[in-house]
Each structure stands twice: as C-alpha cells, then as structure tokens.
C-alpha cells in the first residue's frame, strides 16, 4: 500500500522513501515514490471517473462523503495516533485534528448549498437559473503540519462539487495519507474518484505540470506556492488555490488582565511547536511598566512550557517539530536574529540530537532596524517594544505576507482602529490568532495566498457558476424587434 490509483493499491516504481517519527528517529513507513507514468495513470483514472461522479448528483455524492465521516469516527483513535507518530504532535492535539476532519463534512455540505448551490427566479425574460459545475480533475497538495485536516479541507468540498482528485501529500507524512485514503476506499468511493500518489519534488512536479489537470489546490510554503503560481501563468483556464504562510503580528495594548494576555500569546505562538501558518511570529508590546510586567510573566511562562514526545504522560503542550532539519533551522534562525542585534529572553534549544524536539524561544528584536521578513516556522517569538499604537500597526504591516493578525486590548475603539488599518485575511480581537473557525473563510493577502480563501469558502474554488435563462417551450414575443417580420 503506497499509491491508490483507479481504486487499487500499487507499489511505487520510483526511488525508496521513508517516514521517520521525529520524536525518536524511528522509521514508521517505507515505500517507493510514484513515477511520472504512475502520475499519468492517476490523472487518467480521475479523468475517466469524473463525469459519472458528477452525474451521480449531489445527494448521492454526499451519502458517500458521509460514509467517509463514519469511517473517520470509527477509526479516529488510529488516525490520531498515526498523525501523532508521523508529525511528533502530542496526542491531545492530534485528537482535535481528527475531530476537525469529522466536523468538516457537515460544514462542507452547508458551504456547498450556501456558496455554490442552485438558485432559480422567474423573470420577464424567462426562468433565470444559477447552477454550479465542477472544474473536472484537480490536484490537492497537502502539508505536513496538519496532514489530515488541511488536505481534507480541499478534498471533501472538491468531491462534493463533483470533481475528481489526485492527492499528493507531503513526503514527510505518507502514512497519514495512506490511512486517510483507505478510509475513503472503505466508504465506497467509486474507483478513480480519489487517487493517491506519494513522492517528493519530482512527483509533485509531474503532477503539477500535467496538462490534463483542471485545477490545483495547494497548502504549504510561500516559496513553493509562488513557483506554482509562475507555472500556472498563461493558463487562465485552470483554477489555482494557494494557501501559504504568514509572518503574523500580535499587538498588546492596554490589557489589564496580563495573565489572560500571556495565555493567548502562548497559544498564538507556541501551539503545534509554532508550526501553524497562523502562528504569531512578531509580538508588539507597549513600552512602560505594564509592558515590562507582561514580558516578565511571558518569559517565565515560556520557560515552563512542557515539551516532549507525542506519547509522553502527562501530555506536553509542545511535541516535536517535523524533523531534525526543521529543528536545526530554528536554531539557525535564532542565531541570525542574535547576530543582527536580537537579545534572547528565553533561548530556543535543540533538546535531543536526531530528533525535532526543541524548547520554545522568545527574543527581543527591538534593536534590529529592519527585521527579516521571514516565516520562521517554529516556536520562536520575536518581541518588539513600541511607543505608540500607530507605530505598532505600521510595524505590524511591514511584511509581504498577510495571513493572520491579532490585537489584545480592552478598548473596542482600539480594535476598530486596528481592524481598519491592519492588512490580513484573519484578524482576531482578544483571542489567539491560531483559532480559526471552519464556518468562516480562511486565507490571506499578499504572499499568503492568491485570493482563494479556503475553509467555508473552499466551495468557491471547487466549482464555477453557470447562468441560464430557460423556458419550457419556444415562443414568440408579443412584439417583434424593429426590422423583423415573420
């Protein structure tokens, strides 16, 4: 079991790949990558199945998707454990991920009907009908940080709309993908409707460049997303939905309950070991005694964050990062900021060689004139002290990204002022900025996306509108146009 094509499991014909548990360096999955020929076979299977899948109708498609939900519920413990082992996230967190996958079914069905259903109105010219049709064959590229929930958020609405899908997961989480697709198979999904190809860059390039794709839905790094955007330039007939990262700001202003503020900062910056695209990367705190008190409490709390393997008891708040390479990258990012003038208040450290386990870091970068506009994808929060609110907002907007932003403030006026001026697709007030709702759109501006918001708005990029004016019979108008005679 490695690749799923035309309703059958196939071994890969490419080179060997393995999945490593980043918390203990143990191999938990092995296989071979898909070749270009196997990618072709997957696309051909999806093309062959697409029209019949569409013609089943929404209700029949929904019944199969709901059968998949039943499979998720029946296998949620195994799926949560698989996600935990492959990503290093603690078990409490992967259980919530599987819960989000289950909840996505009802949300996607509601979004289909609200965003892309059918609407008819009688007009003097006839019956005006708006329908939505699937694009056809689409690819879904999944990330490693939420290897179940995020690709699920593309696949479910795509299938409900009548598309067929080729799923290419992250090469770091193949076991989760294999288990997910096996649950679709058990749900009775017709052959060819969902296909799985595993692999690294070569497999991804073969799929992304395939001429028979009608669209591609991507969640991942800004670098890869920009490459895909360039690749799709000159192909206006193909739909491209990009969900990328962010260099996200969180501003603190005039908060009396600093303990609650510290809690929201921790949840914004360090959950998932900082490996959420919405995580706070930059923290702006007012100068003065109140700001000093908040920072002292924050630094103490960061030092107390429990870090450990996915299965540690009692459970840690932070598990492993996705790999040892990622952990070393965060140490290097911290060193770079220190060399530029940053002062570590809490040092991020690589806890165990061969693993992705790191301790969280907090670094004061106020003295750095121009901060690197980078998404450091890990548990390292950059602190900036500010003198006035306008300065804080200006600094917060100094990024090419625009995914999430937040304000912790007791004043509603301050929030309204902030909301009008901040540039981001997700803006929260007195809530962690990693707390997105599946009943709302999810997406950013700038280098964070291409204006194809996902979550509840994923239905929008899974179908295109068809406008019709209809009548039950051909009929002459009461008055002919000038110059006509019959």
From Swiss-Prot:
Biological process terms from the Gene Ontology for this record are: arginine catabolic process to glutamate; arginine catabolic process to succinate
Query: Which PROSITE patterns does this entry report, sorted A to Z?
Result: ALDEHYDE_DEHYDR_CYS, ALDEHYDE_DEHYDR_GLU
Give the keywords, sorted.
Arginine metabolism, NAD, Oxidoreductase
- GO MF term list: succinylglutamate-semialdehyde dehydrogenase activity
Q: Does the keyword Oxidoreductase apply?
A: yes
Return the Gene3D superfamilies for the record: Aldehyde Dehydrogenase, Chain A, domain 1, Aldehyde Dehydrogenase, Chain A, domain 2
**Where on this chain does NAD(+) bind?**
220-225
Task: Fetch the InterPro entries from UniProt.
Answer: Ald_DH/histidinol_DH, Ald_DH_C, Ald_DH_CS_CYS, Ald_DH_CS_GLU, Ald_DH_N, Aldehyde_DH_dom, SuccinylGlu_semiald_DH_AstD
Give the top-level enzyme category. Answer: oxidoreductase
Catalytic residue list: 243, 277
A Pfam cross-reference name = Aldedh
Q: Record keywords: Oxidoreductase included? A: yes
Q: What EC number(s) is this enzyme filed under?
A: 1.2.1.71
User: HAMAP family per the record?
Assistant: Aldedh_AstD
What name goes with this protein? Answer: N-succinylglutamate 5-semialdehyde dehydrogenase
Q: Identify the taxonomic lineage of the organism of origin.
A: Bacteria, Pseudomonadati, Pseudomonadota, Gammaproteobacteria, Alteromonadales
Which gene is this protein's source? astD
């Amino acid at each position: 079991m490695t690749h799923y094509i035309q309703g059958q499991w196939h071994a890969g014909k490419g080179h060997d790949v393995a999945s490593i548990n980043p918390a203990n360096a143990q191999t938990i999955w092995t296989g071979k990558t898909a070749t270009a020929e196997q990618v072709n076979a997957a696309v051909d299977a999806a093309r062959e199945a697409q029209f019949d899948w569409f013609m089943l109708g929404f209700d029949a498609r929904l019944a199969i998707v709901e059968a998949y939900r039943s499979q998720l519920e029946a296998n949620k413990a195994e799926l949560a454990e698989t996600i935990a082992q492959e990503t290093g996230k603690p078990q409490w967190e992967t259980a919530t991920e599987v819960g989000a996958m289950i909840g996505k079914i009802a949300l996607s069905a509601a979004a289909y009907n609200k965003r892309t259903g059918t609407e008819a109105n009688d007009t003097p010219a006839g019956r005006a009908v708006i329908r939505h049709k699937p694009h056809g064959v689409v690819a879904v590229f999944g990330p490693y940080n939420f290897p179940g929930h995020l690709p699920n958020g593309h696949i479910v609405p795509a299938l409900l709309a009548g598309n067929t899908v080729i799923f290419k997961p992250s090469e770091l989480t193949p076991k989760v993908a294999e288990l997910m697709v096996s649950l679709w198979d058990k749900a009775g999904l017709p052959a060819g409707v969902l296909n799985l190809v595993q692999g690294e860059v070569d497999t991804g390039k073969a799929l992304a460049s395939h001429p028979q794709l009608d669209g591609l839905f991507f969640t991942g790094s800004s670098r890869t997303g920009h490459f895909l955007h360039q690749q799709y330039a000159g192909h206006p007939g193909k739909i491209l939905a990009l969900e990328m990262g962010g260099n996200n700001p969180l501003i603190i202003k005039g908060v009396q309950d600093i303990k609650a503020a510290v809690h929201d900062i921790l949840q914004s910056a360090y959950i998932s070991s900082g490996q959420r695209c919405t995580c706070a990367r930059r923290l702006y705190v007012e100068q003065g005694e109140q700001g000093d008190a908040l920072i002292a409490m924050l630094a103490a709390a960061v030092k107390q964050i429990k870090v450990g393997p996915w299965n540690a008891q009692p459970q840690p708040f932070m598990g492993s990062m996705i790999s040892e390479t990622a952990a070393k990258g965060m140490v290097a990012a911290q060193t770079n900021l220190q060399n530029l003038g940053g002062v570590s208040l809490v040092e991020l450290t690589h806890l165990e060689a061969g693993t992705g386990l790191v301790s969280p870091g907090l670094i004061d970068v106020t003295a750095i004139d121009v901060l690197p506009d980078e998404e450091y994808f890990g548990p390292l929060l950059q602190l900036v002290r500010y003198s006035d609110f306008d300065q804080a907002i200006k600094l917060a907007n100094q990024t090419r990204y625009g995914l999430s932003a937040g304000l912790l403030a007791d004043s509603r006026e301050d929030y309204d002022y902030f909301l009008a001026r901040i540039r981001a697709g997700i803006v929260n007030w007195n809530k962690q900025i990693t707390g997105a709702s599946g009943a709302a759109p999810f997406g950013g501006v700038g280098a964070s996306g291409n204006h194809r918001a996902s979550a509840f708005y994923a239905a929008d990029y899974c179908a295109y509108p068809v406008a019709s004016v209809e009548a039950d019979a051909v009929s002459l108008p009461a008055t002919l146009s000038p110059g006509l005679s019959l």
